[in-house]
Swiss-Prot record:
NCBIfam families: nucleoid_noc, parB_part. It comes from Listeria monocytogenes serotype 4a (strain HCC23). SMART domains: ParB. Residues 146-165 bind DNA. Effects nucleoid occlusion by binding relatively nonspecifically to DNA and preventing the assembly of the division machinery in the vicinity of the nucleoid, especially under conditions that disturb the cell cycle. It helps to coordinate cell division and chromosome segregation by preventing the formation of the Z ring through the nucleoid, which would cause chromosome breakage. GO terms for cellular component: chromosome; cytoplasm; nucleoid. Keywords: Cell cycle, Cell division, Cytoplasm, DNA-binding, Septation. Belongs to the ParB family. This is Nucleoid occlusion protein. InterPro entries: Chromosome_partition/occlusion, HTH_ParB/Spo0J, Nucleoid_occlusion_protein, ParB/RepB/Spo0J, ParB/Sulfiredoxin_dom, ParB/Sulfiredoxin_sf. Gene3D superfamilies: 1.10.10.2830, 3.90.1530.30. GO terms for biological process: chromosome segregation; division septum assembly; positive regulation of sporulation resulting in formation of a cellular spore. The keyword Lipid metabolism does not apply. Signal peptide: none annotated.
Length: 287
């Protein structure tokens, strides 16, 4: 079955594609031994919410497994999970010996794609899990970033930006994976030149509980970027100087007018240059 079944068409919904592939050639539901089933090697999720699994287990204890898991046979009587790992983990926690399953014949590319899309649609992945899943699919060389973006409902730039997180040191990736720092924190660390700087700043973020804005400010310090001097700070000074000059000029002119009104014949001239105002007052010695 070609990988294009999932990534070659635009008009169908992602989950419809998965359901159609799973339904095609569906065999009857079988009860498979739990010890003959192993997790999906392409499972993008590396951290499972144990509280949610426990909640699911309580539901299964009362109602049973309503929706069978989907598997593929890897060796005679050994099966890999395609979809339903949370159900498998919940049943495992209940120490049940068997689980209802549907066996499908899918290749690696289709299994990887289904695992990614199922998680994106049904439960949020961490940014690192999502990035690694994208890389896994692209490394199979069966799909372009653009085609992948169309099928998972993302923009090509969103996928590219997500994958940039994989350029960070493993220590930083683990911090994102474990939700010790946010994706925005991690993105800001990409501005630093070396892994040593990135790991060192990660420690500072944890120690000081910095938010993203504080982290970005610290990065500017590390990079030696000087903040531009705000022009607004100098405007009041220039305005004050201009205002003082006008007051001085008006005061002089008023004084000259007052003297003229008292009968004194004055010759008043003013000249403006780039650097100063020049005022000349000539007072005749004789009337």
């Amino acid at each position: 079955m070609p990988f294009s079944r999932l990534f070659g068409k635009k008009e169908k919904n992602q989950m419809d594609d998965i359901d159609n592939i799973v339904e095609e050639g569906v065999q009857r539901v079988q009860e498979l031994p739990m010890d003959k089933i192993f997790p999906n090697q392409f499972q993008p999720r590396t951290v499972f919410d144990q509280d949610k699994i426990d909640e699911l287990a309580r539901t299964i204890r009362i109602h049973g497994v309503i929706q069978p898991i989907v598997v593929r046979e890897m060796e005679p009587d050994y099966y890999e999970i395609i979809a339903g790992e949370r159900r498998f983990r919940a049943v495992l926690s209940l120490e049940m010996e068997k689980i209802p399953a549907i066996i499908q014949n899918l290749d690696d590319e289709e299994v990887a794609a289904i695992a990614l899309i199922e998680n994106l649609q049904r439960e949020e992945l961490t940014p690192i899990e999502e990035a690694k899943a994208y890389r896994s699919l692209l490394d199979m060389q069966e799909v372009t970033q653009e085609a992948l973006a169309q099928r998972v409902g993302k923009s090509q730039s969103a996928i590219a930006n997500k994958m940039r997180l994989l350029k960070l040191p493993e220590t930083v990736q683990e911090a994102v994976l474990n939700k010790q720092i946010s994706e925005r924190h991690a993105r800001s660390l990409l501005a630093l030149e070396t892994e040593e700087q990135q790991v060192a700043l990660l420690a500072e973020i944890a120690e000081n509980h910095w938010n993203v804005k504080q982290t970005e400010a610290r990065i500017q310090e590390i990079l030696g970027v000087k903040k531009p001097v705000a022009t607004k700070k100098t405007k009041p000074k220039r305005q004050a100087i201009s205002r003082d000059v006008r007051i001085a000029m008006n005061t002089i002119k008023q004084s000259v007018t007052m003297v003229k009104d008292n009968g004194m014949d004055l010759d008043f001239t003013e000249e403006e240059t780039d650097d100063f105002y020049q005022i000349t007052i000539q007072i005749p010695k004789k009337k």
